[in-house]
Amino acid sequence: MVDFAGWSMPVQYSSIVSEHLGTREGVGLFDVSHMGRVVVEGDQAAEWLESMLTRQVRDLSVGRSRYTLITGVDNTDETVQCDGDPVILDDAIVARLANLEGGGHRFSIVVNASNRPRVVRWLKACLPQEGVRLHDTTEETAMIAVQGPLVFGRVQEGILEGPLRNVFSSEILEKVAALKNYGVLETEFDGKPVLVSRSGYTGEDGVEIISSSLSAVMLWERLLEHNTTRPCGLGSRDTLRLEAAMPLYGHELCETTDPFSAGLGFAVNVDGRNFPGADGIRIRRGAGGRCRVGLVFDSRRAARTGDHVLLSEDGTESVCGEITSGSFSPTSERGIALAVVDRVVGNPGQELEVLVRGTRLPVKVVSLPFYRRSHQ
């Protein structure tokens, strides 16, 4: 167990490799209750979030979610304003829930554990005097990710036989299985509301379930009762997301990251919008001389964050980038890494070197992601 943003978290239950491969081949169960969970609601909730997030939300249908960035400006903690150098406070998933009975809008936002205090403080500071309410539900809820090709199991006599069958009725399970990627469903477990999202952080099919903290142990135990399911810790979650080329705050993005160079341009809608730091991000669009790439080693050795990427040409050597995340890949059985490099050396097939603890290791640029599931 390790401390992670104030939460006691397991790095592994058995081994990182076995948990990783178990998720790729069966079902991995992840307690991700450390992630921050916020509910935003009110008559002006959609309009307010439209002014706070880098992705549009007014066109988000009920029952749908999307990836976004939460931005501020260079003095975010002191002053609420939109002008100034952009600061990326976090990346997040925003979901549109069923409207309130009185007609107001409801949204769920999931943020990173380490950034939750600052993000919640910033959002609360930006709230209008009326029309929007924000509630940090992290302490009163839990979040469990169920990931892998056998999450829904196989159909036996018209019934899905995966671990979710231990949690939901056949009728609800059919609705969950019918969700498209980033679809969400509000339902119940143990007589209490739950939010089920067809999403994850592993590159596999699966769902993430937000439940009452009072029901979390029962939910976890019910899911573990299925013979395809195994518990997984932070270690395998990181290697799985790396193979899927999913960004991690503090690695692929930080306060000063240019989202376009980091491969996150899809998460930024700047045209005609004025979220915090929008002007600064608009200036960066198209101006970046760097790009995010995948690097594959020809051995099991792995680079670490901050290691230099080198280009050797005509007898000279120059630093052309740096590693943002690196690890041994249990699926391919060799080292892989995400890096930000000069755009001129970012094409697939480009041969480079990485300086790992004083040793130059050859790498090749490859298309991302490193792993793409074959079972759709």
Show where each model-derived region lies:
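Acidic, proline/glycine-enriched N-terminal capping motif
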Residues: M1-D77, Q81, V87
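Generic internal hydrophobic packing segments that stabilize the cores of diverse globular domains
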Residues: A46-E50, Y67, D91, R106, ...
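Conserved, structured C-terminal
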Residues: D3-F4, S8-V11, V17, T79-C82, ...
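Glycine-rich, Trp-frequent "lid" loop and neighboring beta-strands that shape
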Residues: I93-R96
